[in-house]
Every structure is written in C-alpha cells, then in structure tokens.
Amino acid sequence: MEWKGRDVISVRDFSKEDIEFVLKIAERLEERLNKKGHLEYARGKILATLFFEPSTRTRLSFESAMHRLGGSVIGFSSAASTSVKKGESLADTIKTVEQYSDVIVIRHPMEGAARLAAEVAEIPVINAGDGSNQHPTQTLLDLYTIKRAFGRIDGLRIGLLGDLKYGRTVHSLAEALAFYDVELYLISPELLRMPKHIVEELREKGVKVHETTDLEGTVPELDVLYVTRIQRERFPDEQEYLKVKGSYQVNCAVLKNAKESLKIMHPLPRVDEIHPEVDRTPHALYFRQVFSGVPVRMALLGLTLGVLEG
C-alpha cells in the first residue's frame, strides 16, 4: 500500500493490515519521542488545520503531532474568521489552502465534507470529523490505546455507551472493531441506538453484538467501556434531546461489580456521563487516550507526507 499522498477519510477505506501498520508506526514514534522529545521528519512541511466546528483535543493533538515531527502549522479554529463568512465555497477554500500547505486536516459539520475536500485537493486530506458520519483518526487512537493497555484487541468484550445514533466516534470504532475477534455491547437509550445498517454490517462480518439499555447489568461482562457524550448539537429536535439527557452516568457505584481490569475510555469532552470520582480509579483510561492522539496522528501525517516509511 502506497501511503504517500493518501487521503484518510473513512475507516471503510482501511484494511486490517493498514490499521495494524499505523499502530506499529505510532508505537515506534512514541518510543522515539520518549527518548528525544522532538523529531525532524517533517522539517519544511506545513500542515493546514481547517476546523469549521469546535475542537480541543483533535485540533491541538494534530498541531502537537506536526510540531513534534519538526513541521509547521497554519489554519483556523472557526469559520467565522474566514472568507466562508463572505460566501466562499468549501471547494474554493480547499483549493486556496492547498497552495500554502502540504497536508490538510479538516473538521466540518456536513457529512461528506472531507470526501469532497479530498476530491478537490491534490495534497493529502485527513478527516477530523464530518458531521455524525466518521472520525477515523479518533478510531485509530482508540485502537492504539486499547492495544497498549491490554497488549491485544482480539478476545476483548467492549461496550459502547451513550449516543450511538449520532456519535461519529462510535460509528467509526464499531466498523474498525469488526476486523477483530471482539464481542460488542451496544448500550444506549432506545432513541439513540446504533444505526441499524451498522449493526447489520457488524453481524454480517461475524461480530457478536448485544444491544441493551442496561448499563449496570452489562458492566461486569466488559473489558472496555467506551463512554460517549449525548451530543445536544446533533439533535434536530430539542425535545428529543431532553428525553435522553442524563440517561447514564458512570460512577463508582456503577463500577462496583466491574472486573478489576476494566478500562473506561471516552473521546471527550465529557459533561456528566463520567463522574470525576472515576478519574482516581485504575479503570480510568481516557487521559492516556488523549495522549495517544499524538503518536497516532504523527504516524498518519508522516506516512501521508511520505517522510516516514514502515
């Protein structure tokens, strides 16, 4: 597989071999970072970060990743300060920005925006989230986090909790987990169940899938509990949001019958779905998960720029 110039738009564009290759490169980069703190693979290269939606971790970890590779960063964190406010099209914005950069990272509220950007641009485009559709780099760092914690992904029982209808992180993650020998527990309110087509695809690929509303009854079965925020901004109807707001909270009482080895993950930001008391337990893995974004995104940037090899 030729990585130089490759777009990263959807988990569906990856094979299991692709995923394992990225995780291997990320692990190697993390080891080198721990020794040196700063690398020079991308010296002279420029990353453009185009964030049409709010972001803390994704934007900053991409910027950190590029700086740690020795490259530079330009971009914006809000469309309000760009010519989009004057009516400029997404295509024209992309064609303009690629004149200044070597790789583009884009987050946009419209599903399919990253794919459109990739079709227009002649430089690599990396999807940092397009509406409620896909978030492939989050998925890769999630898999990396799990593998670093357990030494494997195969054989694990993994629960996805919360907004499974609109949550792009769980859509991408579920699709990627289908490459592995895992058992999935989909825990959500009835109104926020995983889209039917994703569940059907998982089962067609041989994944054992359980759908439930019962968090406490499911926790003892799990090796990983992946918690998501119920995303108010994704709901077309405020009343629909109010019906499911605060449906679940992971706290020490909920975890009383959990395996000692259970790890809790969250793509963040959290609101109240994980109580802060959980932060002090051995179960909490979400801040290590945040760190994983740096080596994984370093790997993706380096590979697509052609400055890293296997």
Swiss-Prot record:
InterPro entries: Asp/Orn_carbamoyltranf_P-bd (IPR006132), Asp/Orn_carbamoylTrfase (IPR006130), Asp/Orn_carbamoylTrfase_sf (IPR036901), Asp_carbamoyltransf (IPR002082), Asp_carbamoyltransf_Asp/Orn-bd (IPR006131)
Reactions catalysed according to its record: carbamoyl phosphate + L-aspartate = N-carbamoyl-L-aspartate + phosphate + H(+)
GO BP field: 'de novo' pyrimidine nucleobase biosynthetic process; 'de novo' UMP biosynthetic process; amino acid metabolic process
Gene3D superfamilies, A to Z: Aspartate/ornithine carbamoyltransferase
Superkingdom of origin: Archaea
Pathway the protein takes part in: Pyrimidine metabolism; UMP biosynthesis via de novo pathway; (S)-dihydroorotate from bicarbonate: step 2/3
One Pfam family, short name: OTCace_N
Record-listed L-aspartate binding positions: K86, R168, R229
Binding positions for carbamoyl phosphate per the UniProt entry: R57, T58, R107, H135, Q138, L268, P269
EC number: 2.1.3.2
Group of enzyme by EC: transferase
MF term (GO), any: aspartate carbamoyltransferase activity
PROSITE patterns, per the entry: CARBAMOYLTRANSFERASE
Keywords: Pyrimidine biosynthesis, Transferase
Function description: Catalyzes the condensation of carbamoyl phosphate and aspartate to form carbamoyl aspartate and inorganic phosphate, the committed step in the de novo pyrimidine nucleotide biosynthesis pathway.
Family: Belongs to the aspartate/ornithine carbamoyltransferase superfamily. ATCase family.
NCBIfam families assigned: asp_carb_tr, PRK00856.1
Subunit structure: Heterooligomer of catalytic and regulatory chains.
Identification of the protein by name: Aspartate carbamoyltransferase catalytic subunit
